[in-house]
Amino acid sequence: MSTVPARNAGREHIVEGLTRIAGFDLTLAQLLQDQPEAMLGSNHVAKYKANPGVLVKLLDAAERLTLQVHPTREKALELFGSPFGKTECWHILDCRTIEGQEPCIYMGFREGVTRAHWEHCFHTQDIPAMLACLHKIPVKKGDTFIVRGGVPHGIGAGCFLVEIQEPTDYTIRTERTTPFGLAVADSMCHQGLGFTRMFDCFNYAGASLDEILAHYQVTPIEEVLEGCTLQHIIYPEVTNMFALDLVTVTGHATLNSGTFSGIYVLEGSGQLAGQPIARCDHFFLPAACSDLSVTADPDAPLKFLRFFGPQ
C-alpha cells in the first residue's frame, strides 16, 4: 500500500511504486487527494492532510540486499526537508535457504565501530568488513523487528517479509555494487546528500547482540475475540508511527478500529463486508468502515495482515 513514488536512478521519468485501485484508472494517492476525510478520517487529515502516513511493502529477497540506513525524523527534516523519516518494521512471513545461505538479517553496529572506520569501509568498498561491522541475526517465520531510523541494516537472501514504514523512500546505501553484480548509482547511495553528509544519517552507538535483540526484536501480543484471534505485531508500546496486526478468522467476526487500515490476505477465503476475499487479495479500508464484518469459509480459515497509519 503505497502513495510514495519510488526513487530509482535512470527511471526518474517513470511514475512507479504507487498503489493502483483495481478496476479504475486511479492511484490510491489520487483517491486520498480527492476524498481525504472520507478515506482517512477528519482527525488524521487535520494532522497529516491527504498523506496516510504509512507505506507497506512485501519483499522477497532472492539475494542479500545492500547494506543501508534510513534517516530519523529529525535527520529527515534537517537533510531532506521531510516531516517523515523512515523507521520501519519487518515481519518475516516465510524463509528459505538459497545456495547454502541460511535466512538472516543484519542490524546495528557492533561495539567499537566508528564513523571513520565505516567511511573507510565504504570508500574502499570492503564489503566483508562492512558486513563484519553489523550483527548477523538468523531469522525464522514469525520473527518481527523494528528498524529505527539511523540503525544500519540489511536483509539476507531467502527472507520473505512484510515491511511497514514511514512514507518516504530515503535510503542511504553503502554498497556500490549489489551482490548479484549490478552497479548502484551515486544518487542511490547518497540520495543527493553527497558522499560525506550521507554518513550523518547513521547512529554510531555500538551494542552487543543481546542489546540489539532487546531493543529491536518485537514480541507480539495475542488477543482472543469472538470468531477470531488478533496478534498485535506492532503496537503503541513499540512505536506510534504505525501498527500491524495478524488476524486469524475461524468463523464470523466483527473488527473495528475507528480509523483507516489496509489488508493483505495471506491464507484462506471468505467474505469481507459481504464481498468474497481470498489469498493474495489486498484492500484499503476507509475510515468510514468502523465495523468490519469478516466471515471465513468453513474449510478455509482466513489469515490476513491488517495495518494502520500513525496512532
PLM segments and residue spans:
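Short, basic/aromatic beta-hairpin or loop at an interaction surface
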Residues: 114-127, 256-264
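Short histidine-centered beta-strand/loop micro-motifs
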Residues: 57, 67, 78-81, 252-257, ...
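Loop-centered beta-sheet repeat module
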Residues: 122-174
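Transition-metal
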Residues: 1-114, 177-222, 244, 311
